[in-house]
Amino acid sequence: MGEACSYTLNSNVFQIRELNYKKDMRLFDEIVEHENRVFGEGSVGKWNIKPFTKYGKVFVVVKKLKNLENNREVECNNSTYENKIDEELVSVIEILRGFDYKIAYIYGVSTVTGYEGQGHATRLFGYVMDYLLKQDISIVELTVGVNNEAAKKLYKKAGFAIMEKLENEYGKNIDRYLMRYTRK
């Protein structure tokens, strides 16, 4: 797992970390609810979030909350996991790795309503890119809505380039750009 890091913004403490498929089940529900609002049918979904954390990677920014005494272990499906109610979801990125182990695909990047425009996705994206490069990934790909100017700006700033327009990628008239980062 990647090493967690923390930062402070407006007197709040935020942590960037990789999710654990056994210990972070409560956050799975938050991610699915959030992504359903943001991406609709394109969200990671309740059946896919756990395999993403187990066989891919899911990184989050969480806001650390004040009442730490509410941490407790909870039994679920004969597995014990930590119910971390001392944090709330801020941003999330899901990643898949290709069969060619030098390629990774960023499935989703999003920030919870109320936290947009504060730099959380930018910090998380930088953390994830550093992590991928340390894993000897040489190509990172993602798709983005053709009209999503904020996301395109973030990705271009990180070194991504638009490779092609994918017409009807997610259905009729739902076009996306394929963007790629290639290690130099």
Which ranges hold each PLM region?
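Eukaryotic N-terminal low-complexity, Ser/Thr- and Lys/Arg-rich leader segments
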Residues: 1-11
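Acetyl-CoA-dependent GNAT
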Residues: 11-114, 125-127, 131
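C-terminal "cap" of GNAT-fold acetyltransferases
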Residues: 5-7, 145-149, 158, 165-184
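Short aromatic/hydrophobic contact patches that present stacked aromatics
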Residues: 108-110, 141-143, 178
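Conserved GNAT acetyl-CoA-binding A-motif
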Residues: 132-143
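Conserved glycine-rich acetyl-CoA-binding loop
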Residues: 112-126, 145-153, 157
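Structural motif
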Residues: 135, 157-158
